[in-house]
Amino acid sequence: MPSPSVTSPQVAVNDIGSAEDFLAAIDKTIKYFNDGDIVEGTIVKVDRDEVLLDIGYKTEGVIPSRELSIKHDVDPNEVVSVGDEVEALVLTKEDKEGRLILSKKRAQYERAWGTIEELKEKDEAVKGTVIEVVKGGLILDIGLRGFLPASLVEMRRVRDLQPYIGKEIEAKIIELDKNRNNVVLSRRAWLEQTQSEVRSEFLNQLQKGAIRKGVVSSIVNFGAFVDLGGVDGLVHVSELSWKHIDHPSEVVQVGDEVTVEVLDVDMDRERVSLSLKATQEDPWRHFARTHAIGQIVPGKVTKLVPFGAFVRVEEGIEGLVHISELSERHVEVPDQVVQVGDDAMVKVIDIDLERRRISLSLKQANEDYTEEFDPSKYGMADSYDEQGNYIFPEGFDPETNEWLEGFDKQREEWEARYAEAERRHKMHTAQMEKFAAAEAEAANAPVSNGSSRSEESSGGTLASDAQLAALREKLAGNA
């Protein structure tokens, strides 16, 4: 049985209507653009001179390489790749060759202007990448070319701008003129605003009396500025040292790491007052802690006054030797006994921490002199327990008269103190010889040796106790 025949449907030309209807149907499938329109498309070809973009037009759109990026002389392959979806602005609907000419950078420019105008309105920062160094500053890619003057790159003028190439930075928009295609930026303004915010937060957390570490950032005649971590505080020259100084550079240098105490935080003026000397022991307290009344100490005469002589016994510490404490004989004026610049062994007879005064005596120091060396008089104060037994240095065995192993540091410290005490005794001996000659000349008569005027030390010292004297000799032998 023959199969039935299948016939194809017949379509008449007039099934789609008139010729006008046919052209209208074709027209609906074609996209139309005007100059200035922004279109979307897919990259279909990348050449050195141009890029082809499929935007659904009767022909591909052409993006000349110079219209790909705001950067100059770029390789198209570094900007786009086949398959990329991009936006472009219509420059010319049809050039001499009938091509649709597009610009990627102009589309980016138009989009960016809207964003930048909005940021400028809100006084917010814009973020961009440094793409070029030009005369007078930098060019940033912020969707368009933004100019950042060299004077506004940092808080201080930057000489070499090359290291900024490729860096992403934030800046405030200070000038904006679309008609002139002009965008001027300021990173310094952004830094000032940011640092001000950080500074306020930091100052709110900073407490009076707090101890902080910092780095000396600059030195001026009236003090030194210390960077505490983004916020600078001032150490006034009077707070740099316990001793008198003429210039801050005598104490610190730029770059020095220092420990300071916060004296005051002025929130209204955003100023921080610091002190370096407050973190260091008061030399007066140090002297009181390391010296006892009755000790004989070395000093240097610094000033003569009608009522006596001032003697410096430590850096920043001066005491008064009253005129009545200069000599056993009657003294009319201090220079009959001492001169400025003289070295003198003096006895500490009073320490007034509250008034920051030390009373000294040259006369009593000489009266206490003995030819036999007594370390306790010259800084090696003896220690005794409640039963009156001498407390030996840590690490020293009185039974064997030997230092124990593992106490090398204690031994070195003891021997150093012993050597210093011995040195002071020798200085005192020299002073006695000098003063004996001076007294003899002044009185025009010989005087007895200073040692005859002194009594033997009382018991309980390394010099007077037989057992402890043996220890002294042993320790002195190891010094």
From Swiss-Prot:
Coiled coil: none annotated. Keywords: Nucleotidyltransferase, Ribonucleoprotein, Ribosomal protein, RNA-binding, Transferase. GO terms for biological process: translation. Residues 36-105, 123-188, 209-277, 294-363 form the S1 motif domain. Gene3D superfamilies: Nucleic acid-binding proteins (2.40.50.140). The keyword Transferase applies. InterPro entries: NA-bd_OB-fold, Ribos_protein_bS1-like, Ribosomal_protein_S1-like, S1_domain. Belongs to the bacterial ribosomal protein bS1 family. Binds uncharacterized protein MSMEG_2731/MSMEI_2664. Binds mRNA, facilitating recognition of most mRNAs by the 30S ribosomal subunit during translation initiation. Plays a role in trans-translation; binds tmRNA (the product of the ssrA gene). Binds very poorly to pyrazinoic acid (POA), the active form of the prodrug pyrazinamide (PZA); POA does not disrupt trans-translation in this organism. M.smegmatis is resistant to the antibiotic PZA. This is Small ribosomal subunit protein bS1. It comes from Mycolicibacterium smegmatis (strain ATCC 700084 / mc(2)155) (Mycobacterium smegmatis). The gene is rpsA.
